[in-house]
């Protein structure tokens, strides 16, 4: 591209900024239980500069960030070949955390937890709370940091140890992305407003709103979840640290087959610190989440062996 010429960025990423501005307006007079921060950061194309500064600012101040939602390129549901998916948004979710030590990564692999990073738990949480008849959207979880060999502003948050994911439209049109505005062989190039689908952007905004509101009003994630690794039994014994919240109603133990993308079962066990489930830890992935008196639930935390 000609870096000396002004170029529009209607989709990349005025669409995401528009979502943030509209949701900030909608929520301005409401009071979530936790703080929701809306931000439009600069310098993404120059090396994720704004996002790096923001993530490090939070980390240096020891801010508890329950989740970061990067909304980037959500302006159109029509791809380069004319394919249309007006009710789908992609959600990119990183696998094993970028901050894990070799020993931590080895333990994760030994228990089959490579698909259960904090980012993927955030992705499952978003899918559960935001893919419904009210948003009229399907959230397509992609098990990858970002599009193939590409990146975005959520990466610095992952590198800082936070759960972070990226929303992106289902099919990109590269005639309208990273292009000088021009007409060539009868084809209009450039990231122009005329190529946006505003109803699609509104549906993506509903997905984001459902996710962030649910996250902000749920009790905090459960920490230090363990499973008894020395007990030879077909039952599974789980332990966890208590969540300090006046909104806490109790905890749910969840599980799914090892090859299932989403949680398939949930068992409310009350306000306790341990639970024994009549299932073998060999055959399923377990997790624990907090449940609020208001009905909101936290993202899941998987157990590691004692």
Curated annotation (Swiss-Prot):
Example of a GO cellular component annotation carried by this entry: extracellular region
Alphabetical list of InterPro entries matching this protein: FN3_dom, FN3_sf, M28_fam, Peptidase_M28
Cofactor note: Binds 2 Zn(2+) ions per subunit.
Cofactor(s), names only, from the UniProt record: Zn(2+)
This protein's UniProt keywords: Glycoprotein, Hydrolase, Metal-binding, Metalloprotease, Protease, Secreted, Signal, Zinc
Binding site for Zn(2+) 1: 12, 72
Pfam families: Peptidase_M28
Compartment(s) where it occurs, according to its Swiss-Prot or TrEMBL record: Secreted
Glycosylated residue positions: 60, 228, 234, 244
EC number: 3.4.-.-
Keyword Thylakoid on entry: no
UniProt superkingdom: Eukaryota
Binding site for Zn(2+) 2: 12, 45
Top EC class for this record: hydrolase
Domain Fibronectin type-III: 218-306
GO molecular function: metal ion binding; metalloexopeptidase activity
GO annotation, biological process: proteolysis
Signal sequence interval, chain numbering: 1-28
Family to which the UniProt record says this protein belongs: Belongs to the peptidase M28 family. M28B subfamily.
Protein name, entry field: Probable zinc metalloprotease VDBG_06923
Source species: Verticillium alfalfae (strain VaMs.102 / ATCC MYA-4576 / FGSC 10136)
């Amino acid at each position: 591209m000609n870096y000396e010429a002004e170029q529009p960025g209607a989709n990349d990423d005025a669409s995401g900024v528009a979502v943030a501005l509209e949701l900030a307006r909608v929520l301005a007079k409401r009071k979530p239980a936790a703080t929701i921060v809306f931000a439009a950061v600069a310098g993404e194309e120059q090396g994720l500069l704004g996002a790096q500064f923001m993530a490090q600012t939070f980390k240096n101040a020891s801010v508890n960030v329950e989740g970061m939602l990067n909304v980037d390129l959500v302006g159109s549901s029509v791809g380069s070949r004319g394919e249309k998916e007006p009710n789908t948004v992609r959600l990119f979710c990183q696998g094993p955390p970028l901050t894990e030590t070799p020993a931590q990564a080895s333990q994760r692999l030994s228990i089959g937890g490579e698909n259960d990073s904090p980012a993927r738990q955030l992705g499952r949480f978003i899918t559960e709370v935001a893919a419904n008849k009210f948003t009229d959207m399907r959230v397509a979880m992609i098990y990858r940091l970002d599009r193939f060999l590409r990146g975005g502003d959520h990466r610095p948050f992952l590198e800082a140890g936070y759960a972070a994911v990226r929303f992106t439209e289902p099919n990109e049109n590269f005639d309208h992305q990273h292009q000088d505005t021009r007409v060539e062989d009868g084809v209009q190039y450039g990231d122009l407003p005329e190529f946006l689908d505003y109803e699609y952007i509104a549906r993506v905004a509903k997905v984001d709103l459902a996710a962030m509101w649910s996250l902000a009003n749920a009790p905090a994630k459960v920490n230090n979840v363990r499973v008894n690794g020395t007990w030879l039994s077909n039952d599974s014994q789980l332990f966890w640290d208590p969540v300090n919240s006046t909104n806490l109603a109790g905890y749910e133990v969840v599980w799914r087959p090892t090859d299932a993308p989403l949680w398939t079962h949930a068992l409310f066990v009350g306000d306790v610190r341990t639970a024994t489930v009549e299932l073998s830890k060999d055959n399923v992935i377990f997790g624990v989440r907090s449940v609020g008196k208001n009905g909101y639930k936290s993202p899941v935390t998987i157990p590691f062996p004692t």
